[in-house]
Amino acid sequence: IPSSLVGSEMCIRDRSKNPVFEVKAVGSYKQKPGCPEFGLTKDESLRLEKICGGECFNPSDERRNITRIEVIKITPQNFNNEPVDDLIQDVWKVFKCKPSQDGCKIRFSDRDFQKNGRDSVYYVRAIEEPSLRVNGDNLRCDYDENGNCIKVNICHGSYLTDKRDDCVTSSEERAWSSPIYVNQI
């Protein structure tokens, strides 16, 4: 499916063919420490330091790796009150990616599309390698032996949280595609 169709609708006229998708995702740029040289006066530099704490948008030429691409498939209801539990497949397919500065490229098909005889909507999620994020785990749970959250440790960003707590945790950033609507004719 051409990238121009992302976020739009298409119809499959040839009932003998299933849709084939190609996806490419690249990671975000890794951040360099500090701020770039802006050619600021001493007063401007001090103000920038006070406001930003010495950290600015300062991307390097190196990208984070995409670790996997997940595909979500949604089949619209055919009638009112049709149960949706089996119509939303999150996650439908998962593709592991090799570390590469060039990103990750996958190709897949919905082999059951024609057989099922129903319209479908597809999204993809590109998942980056873990990186540190402020409030990347906003509840910061303590878990019991069964994996249930038994206590939250919220980072409030106020006097309610110790000022030495920077609230930084590891998180897998993700990017979503626009939907692709594929209709039966």
Describe each region flagged by the PLM.
Residues 24-62:
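Short amphipathic, basic-aromatic surface patches that mediate peripheral association
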Residues 17-21:
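Structural beta-strand segments of beta-rich domains
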Residues 127-140:
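Short acidic/polar inter-strand loop motif in beta-rich domains
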Residues 101-114:
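Exposed aromatic-hydrophobic patches
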Residues 1-7, 12:
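Single conserved hydrophobic/aromatic residue that forms the stacking wall/gate
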Residues 71, 124, 177:
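Divalent metal-coordination and catalytic microenvironments
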Residues 118-130:
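Short, aromatic- and glycine-rich surface loops/edge beta-strands on solvent-exposed regions
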